[in-house]
Amino acid sequence: MIHKNWAELIKPTQLEIKPGADSSRVATVVAEPLERGFGLTLGNALRRVLLSSLQGAAITSVQIDNVLHEFSSVPGVREDVTDIVLNLKGVTLKMDVDAPKRLTLSAKGPGEVKAGDIQESAGITILNRDHVICHLDEGAELHMELAVANGKGYVAADKNRPEDAPIGLIPIDAIFSPVKRVSYEVTPTREGQVLDYDKLTMKVETDGSLTPEDAVAYAARIIQDQLSVFVNFDEPETATRSDAEDGLEFDPRLLKKVDELELSVRSANCLKNDNIVYIGDLIQKTEAEMLRTPNFGRKSLNEIKEVLSGMGLHLGMDVVDWPPENIEDLAKRFDDQF
């Protein structure tokens, strides 16, 4: 009965996404109900992965015409090179290609030089086109070449200097993470008549290259992949039959009606009101779904779990080809086996 370790835990049925003012950048993600303590466990793990492990794009180096190092200045440009480099760190990119690319920027004064002045390449999009890089005086010209790449986390400038870097190439500290801020809160919530559950609320802000909803999904997938190595057993079989005897792909006991399970009147009425007719209908329900049934409480849940356990079944199982089209005929056909 090892499956009880995970199959009988309450799980959130779905995520609730509450978009912020800019839905592509800000959202609140709500998951409930969770077993007590799981809000903190999952919230902390997701936050750390969101901030550290998602792939994004950034400018990794710049080469400006007639500039030998970052402590130089460019005639007619109000900012010195150090300030230009700092402003380049604020350019937000989206790259749909894996290989590093080079972009160019050419501008003439007077006026502001913005991220939108960067000439985009195939598969690369500048997201914050109004971001100011520098200001040019009358008659001033600025020409630069930018190296952009995909990566994760933070990479210091010295790591972005190629071994064969030409004179004048200035490496830049790269912040690849598309996630800017993550906070979470765990509060009590109820499920049916039970109050002792967690509600996880996460506020996620990205740079726009990735939606908050996708960011959370990718972080969860990373955690899932990392934990898979710790699972040292095969999943127990679902409610199917490998020999497919009598032409069925599932246990014929699932065709038995729930009103034959000798449940209490209260439990039986709750199942009836929820249109649960056969055992096959019942075992596909999760605990969370059952507790949302009107007038269905923990006592009824425990009663049903005990009855199913005696049959080698449990809530939350998958059933192949259920319900069959001719379910009533099949139920009559196998009635003598019950």
Swiss-Prot record:
It is an enzyme of class 2 (transferase). One of its GO terms (biological process) is DNA-templated transcription. It comes from the Bacteria. The keyword Phosphoprotein does not apply. Keywords: DNA-directed RNA polymerase, Nucleotidyltransferase, Transcription, Transferase. The keyword Signal does not apply. InterPro entries: DNA-dir_RNA_pol_insert (IPR011262), DNA-dir_RNA_pol_RpoA/D/Rpb3 (IPR011263), DNA-dir_RpoA (IPR011773), RBP11-like (IPR036603), RNAP_asu_C (IPR011260), RNApol_insert_sf (IPR036643). One of its GO terms (molecular function) is DNA binding. Its EC number is 2.7.7.6. SUPFAM superfamilies: C-terminal domain of RNA polymerase alpha subunit, Insert subdomain of RNA polymerase alpha subunit, RBP11-like subunits of RNA polymerase. Residues 1-234 are annotated as: Alpha N-terminal domain (alpha-NTD). Pfam families: RNA_pol_A_bac, RNA_pol_A_CTD, RNA_pol_L. Residues 250-338 are annotated as: Alpha C-terminal domain (alpha-CTD). Disulfide bonds: none annotated. Homodimer. The RNAP catalytic core consists of 2 alpha, 1 beta, 1 beta' and 1 omega subunit. When a sigma factor is associated with the core the holoenzyme is formed, which can initiate transcription. The N-terminal domain is essential for RNAP assembly and basal transcription, whereas the C-terminal domain is involved in interaction with transcriptional regulators and with upstream promoter elements. DNA-dependent RNA polymerase catalyzes the transcription of DNA into RNA using the four ribonucleoside triphosphates as substrates. This is DNA-directed RNA polymerase subunit alpha. It comes from Paracoccus denitrificans (strain Pd 1222). The gene is rpoA.
